[in-house]
Structures are given as structure tokens and as C-alpha cells.
Amino acid sequence: MGILNSISTPADLKALNDEDLDALAKEIRTFLVDKVAATGGHLGPNLGVVELTIGLHRVFDSPQDPIIFDTSHQSYVHKILTGRAKDFDSLRQKDGLSGYTCRAESEHDWTESSHASAALSYADGLSKAKQLDGDTTHSVVAVVGDGALTGGMCWEALNNIAAGKDRKVVVVVNDNGRSYSPTIGGFAENLAGLRMQPFYDRFMEKGKTSLKSMGWVGERTFEALHAFKEGVKSTVIPTEMFPELGMKYVGPVDGHNQKAVDNALKYAHDYDGPIIVHMVTEKGRGYAPAEQDLDELMHSTGVIDPLTGAPKSASKPGWTSVFSDELVKIGAQNENVVAITAAMAGPTGLSKFEANFPNRFFDVGIAEQHAVTSAAGLALGGKHPVVAIYSTFLNRAFDQLLMDVGMLNQPVTLVLDRSGVTGSDGASHNGVWDMALTSIVPGVQVAAPRDEDSLRELLNEAISIDDGPTVVRFPKGDLPTPIVAIDTLEDGVDVLAYEDATDVESTDDAPSVLIIAVGERATVALDVASRIKQHGVNVTVVDPRWIVPIPQSLVALSDDHDLVITIEDGVIHGGVGSLLSDALNASEVDTPRRQIAVPQKYLDHASRNEVLADYGLDADGIETTVVGWLDSLFGE
């Protein structure tokens, strides 16, 4: 790691020669494999942007020239080159480096949301701020993947960026989708190089003016030459990806040729106006196990063997795999069931459905808003769409759920993977807002399964509902031990336990506590119940299964107990506890009620168990909180 050890700031890159740069790129790839193999993370994307990121920091002066990484899962090399290499052993660990850009870590990090398609809007706003401050020298750079360009927000931003002819916005498209070739013959290479020569712009503008001043003949000549140029351009530039926005375009550029990368970025740096630089890169570059992973190119990994790329521990069947299997079974029985993903068929478990029913599967790209409204259209056409997305990405499509699905009472089922606390992926990947958001949609029904069997049951129930939208939410990770209900009430609420108080003369005289456990929180609720009964209270534990709207039996049960506690994995405002409190108030039930939920804040990254413990949401923390309530309410 000779060259890498000498890099502590981006300025250290500027004096390196070609040989040093090649050596540095190799060292960075070795470093990435070694460190990410030990912690897990986004390996493939970062292996693909080594030369690109080196070039960005050689040409631009960060942070004076802001560099914004869309999604920012591909910012590891950026972190290495901005003085954080020494901290990579803590990547995605508690109190360690974030897996995304993080403003608290470095002045070189401008944003920290890991949601796609937002970088160009940030860049548009930053460039406007610089213009208002009279700064005409510095550029704003946005690095966006070809996948993110399937998001409508990118094109909204590009439309505004293109309108700012005197704003220095550099849009670097990191095209690793293998859709376009970086080299299309020698003529294409020469044309791409020609377009980056300063005299080319002057010549084209002067020639255009001269020809048009020659009257009819000049006009026809210009049109013919322009048509020829555009015809040639269309063989080089993927015009279906980059429509005529009125912005300067450079590329395609071989994103692994350092000299070509630097030249293109230098041209963009010196260009007075918005410009698109199209870099073609290879995800997983330089690491054989990633290059051979044709499906994912090691986009994201857990802890792996750095030599083979094999996981260090075998993964257990999780929530997603159960959903995947059950949906295929449902699809085989009901040909009107269709599935929609927003560019995440594998992570959300829809690949198996796609393999079995390719004509009933739709990948809409990174476009959650479109996914939900398209689902409404499918429902209007007599189908029952199942939209599988991560809980955190539902935030982007709330208006579509509220107005396009909910208002029309369409039978669309949203399956929200990674609900609740997700942990190491950081604040913006937690799925803690979905209950608060979905619960305000009139007519929506929301289910929260506690284990494998209830997930299968609730998914079937949701898809059988044909008069309005349904939501099924479940967390990330392994499945808990199955919990068998000891009783089921008329409205479907499962009773999981009756725990009699211990160390009391008569349980009839002991205060009674009702614990309402949401989804997989049933496991910890049963643990807590077995503990607090030793403090002289009788405990009933129930699982509502369908949490929105609040089942009427929960109101009756609350009226029959001396204290009601809700335990959930969403934010405290607007969740099940809030909904229950509203229902009790409406029925004039004055039983004291308390909530165990996620605080109203953005959670730092750590493992899921660490986050739960930090906020008192594990069994120990909940027991301590509940015992305090018992003492204040029933203590002598």
C-alpha cells in the first residue's frame, strides 16, 4: 500500500504520474476487498469507480467544488481519498464509518441520504446558491448511476440544470449497466476526443452563424451538416438515455482509463455551463469473484472470504424468502395477481415470481411513484398488483398511495420489506415511518406478521381483499421462532399469552396489563411479559395481526385491563400506540396507555440489536421502562 499510504488529502493526488496512478488504483481495489470482506458493504459498485473517483479529486477542488454522489453507496473510494482510510475497519459498525456519505464525518461529504435520483436536484440548488453568491469559479459535480436515471426526479432536475446556461454543473453519469459500449470503433473514439477540444465549440458556433448568414443555401447546408453530425452522434451517444436537453455532452469515456477520465473531467471543469460526462465503468472491476457474479456483481455483500468471495456464514431463510415462495404459490392459483418492483427484484424476493410468470412481472426501474400509480392502473384493469419495495422507499410514493390508489379504493397490495429498524445501513434505510404514513390513508388495511406462518396467512388475506389497498410489512433478517396463538378473537386478533402474577396472595387482586405486540415484536413482548409478572401483575399479550384500522377487540380488551402497553418498531407518533389511543378516546375508555416505540429522530447506524438496545427497545430496556410505569401507577 505504498502509494495509498501517502494519500491523506485529495491534494496529494495531483502530483502523481501515470505509473503512480495505476499503482494507486490497484492498491485501492486490494484495500476495498480486504476491508469490505471483513465488515460487509457495497463492494461491487466501489470497485467500479476507482479511476473515476481518483479523477474527480485530481481535477476538482473538493470541498470548494462540491462532489455529490447519488445514493452514495459508491462513495468508499471518495472516503479513502479524503483521509478516512484508517477508519475502514469500522465501516458500517456502531460509532464507525457510515456506508454512505455523512456530513458529520467530513467536509467533503455534502449529503447523506441513501435514496436514489436526488443528487442532481442537490446539485441544481447548490449551483444556484453559488450563482447568487457571485461564485462563477467553482463547479458542482453530481455523480449519478445509469440506474438512478430511471428515476423521474433526475429528469426533473436535468430540465432545470439545462436551463441554467451559465451555471457550472457537471453531471457525471456512471454507466455500469453494461447497456452501452465505451468504445464503438476508432471513429467514435476520435469524435469523442474532438468534442472535448475547446476549438470545437468555437468552430461549431462560428460555422453555424456563418452558414445561416448565407441565406437559403447556407440554411440548407447547415441543416445537412447538422443531420450528418447528429447521425454520427447517435452511433456514439445513447440518445435514448440522453434526450436533447440542450446540455453539452462528452462521452462515452472509458471509466477505467485514468488518462481518458482525467481529460474528460478537465474539459468539464473548464466548460462554462452545465455538461454531461458519460463514463462507462464495470461494477466489480478487478475482483474475480465479483466479475463472475453475473447477477449482482457483488453489489452488496455480508462478511465474505476475500479470496473466494464466499460468505463466511451460510444465510438462513428469512422473511423475504418466505414472501417470495408464498407469492409464487398465490400466483399459480390466481392469474390476476401481478408483481411490480422498482429495480429490486432480487432484494425484494420477486425474482422467483418473474421466473415463473414473466408476463405478469414488471420492473419499472428506480421509480417508486410510478410503480404505485401503475399498480393502480393494473387494478383498474382487473388485476391484483403486488408492489414489493423496501419500507423506506414507500416514503417517496406516499402521494400516489394516498391519491391514486386510496382515493380510488383500488385493490393494490404493498409488501414492505425491511420495515422497522434495519441497523447498519443507516438512518435513511430504516423502515420506521411506514405505519405512520399508511395509517392516514382512508380505507387502507395494514398487516404486521409475527412469524413465517402469519406472513403466509396475512399475504393471502391481503390479496383476497378486493375493495381497497392493503399493506403487509415485515422486518429485515432471520425469521423468529414460530409463535402459536392460544386463542383467536372474532376479529382475528391472536391471544399469545395469559401470564398470572407471581408473589401475590391472589391473582384476582393483582393489576392487569395488556401488551399489544406489533409484528415480530411479539417475541420480545412474550419475554417481557414473563419478567414483569414477577412484579405482581397479570399480563395478557396479544398480536393484532391487522394493525390498521385498530381492531375493535383491542378497545374492549383495553377497557378490561388496568394498563395498556403497545410495543412496535415504528416511530412513536402516528403508529399503533397513537391509533389505539385515538380509538380509546373515541370510546371513552380511560385505561392508562403507554407506548414502546422508536423515538422521533434519525437513528445512527449500528447493528439492529445495538440500535434496539440503545433506545431501550430490547427486552432489558422494555422491562426497565415498564417496571417504572408499574411502580408509578400501582406502587404503594
From Swiss-Prot:
<dbReference type="Pfam" id="PF13292">
    <property type="entry name" value="DXP_synthase_N"/>
</dbReference>
<keyword id="KW-0808">Transferase</keyword>
<keyword id="KW-0414">Isoprene biosynthesis</keyword>
<dbReference type="InterPro" id="IPR009014">
    <property type="entry name" value="Transketo_C/PFOR_II"/>
</dbReference>
<dbReference type="InterPro" id="IPR049557">
    <property type="entry name" value="Transketolase_CS"/>
</dbReference>
<feature type="binding site">
    <location>
        <position position="176"/>
    </location>
    <ligand>
        <name>Mg(2+)</name>
    </ligand>
</feature>
<dbReference type="InterPro" id="IPR033248">
    <property type="entry name" value="Transketolase_C"/>
</dbReference>
<dbReference type="GO" id="GO:0016114">
    <property type="term" value="P:terpenoid biosynthetic process"/>
</dbReference>
<comment type="pathway">
    <text>Metabolic intermediate biosynthesis; 1-deoxy-D-xylulose 5-phosphate biosynthesis; 1-deoxy-D-xylulose 5-phosphate from D-glyceraldehyde 3-phosphate and pyruvate: step 1/1.</text>
</comment>
<comment type="similarity">
    <text>Belongs to the transketolase family. DXPS subfamily.</text>
</comment>
<feature type="binding site">
    <location>
        <begin position="114"/>
        <end position="116"/>
    </location>
    <ligand>
        <name>thiamine diphosphate</name>
    </ligand>
</feature>
<keyword id="KW-0479">Metal-binding</keyword>
<keyword id="KW-0786">Thiamine pyrophosphate</keyword>
<dbReference type="InterPro" id="IPR029061">
    <property type="entry name" value="THDP-binding"/>
</dbReference>
<dbReference type="GO" id="GO:0005829">
    <property type="term" value="C:cytosol"/>
</dbReference>
<dbReference type="InterPro" id="IPR020826">
    <property type="entry name" value="Transketolase_BS"/>
</dbReference>
<keyword id="KW-0784">Thiamine biosynthesis</keyword>
<feature type="binding site">
    <location>
        <position position="176"/>
    </location>
    <ligand>
        <name>thiamine diphosphate</name>
    </ligand>
</feature>
<comment type="subunit">
    <text>Homodimer.</text>
</comment>
<feature type="binding site">
    <location>
        <position position="287"/>
    </location>
    <ligand>
        <name>thiamine diphosphate</name>
    </ligand>
</feature>
<dbReference type="GO" id="GO:0009228">
    <property type="term" value="P:thiamine biosynthetic process"/>
</dbReference>
<keyword id="KW-0460">Magnesium</keyword>
<dbReference type="InterPro" id="IPR005477">
    <property type="entry name" value="Dxylulose-5-P_synthase"/>
</dbReference>
<dbReference type="InterPro" id="IPR005475">
    <property type="entry name" value="Transketolase-like_Pyr-bd"/>
</dbReference>
<comment type="function">
    <text>Catalyzes the acyloin condensation reaction between C atoms 2 and 3 of pyruvate and glyceraldehyde 3-phosphate to yield 1-deoxy-D-xylulose-5-phosphate (DXP).</text>
</comment>
<dbReference type="GO" id="GO:0000287">
    <property type="term" value="F:magnesium ion binding"/>
</dbReference>
<feature type="binding site">
    <location>
        <begin position="147"/>
        <end position="148"/>
    </location>
    <ligand>
        <name>thiamine diphosphate</name>
    </ligand>
</feature>
<feature type="binding site">
    <location>
        <position position="368"/>
    </location>
    <ligand>
        <name>thiamine diphosphate</name>
    </ligand>
</feature>
<dbReference type="GO" id="GO:0019288">
    <property type="term" value="P:isopentenyl diphosphate biosynthetic process, methylerythritol 4-phosphate pathway"/>
</dbReference>
<dbReference type="GO" id="GO:0030976">
    <property type="term" value="F:thiamine pyrophosphate binding"/>
</dbReference>
<dbReference type="GO" id="GO:0052865">
    <property type="term" value="P:1-deoxy-D-xylulose 5-phosphate biosynthetic process"/>
</dbReference>
<protein>
    <recommendedName>
        <fullName>1-deoxy-D-xylulose-5-phosphate synthase</fullName>
        <ecNumber>2.2.1.7</ecNumber>
    </recommendedName>
</protein>
<dbReference type="GO" id="GO:0008661">
    <property type="term" value="F:1-deoxy-D-xylulose-5-phosphate synthase activity"/>
</dbReference>
<feature type="binding site">
    <location>
        <position position="73"/>
    </location>
    <ligand>
        <name>thiamine diphosphate</name>
    </ligand>
</feature>
<feature type="binding site">
    <location>
        <position position="146"/>
    </location>
    <ligand>
        <name>Mg(2+)</name>
    </ligand>
</feature>
<dbReference type="Pfam" id="PF02780">
    <property type="entry name" value="Transketolase_C"/>
</dbReference>
<dbReference type="Pfam" id="PF02779">
    <property type="entry name" value="Transket_pyr"/>
</dbReference>
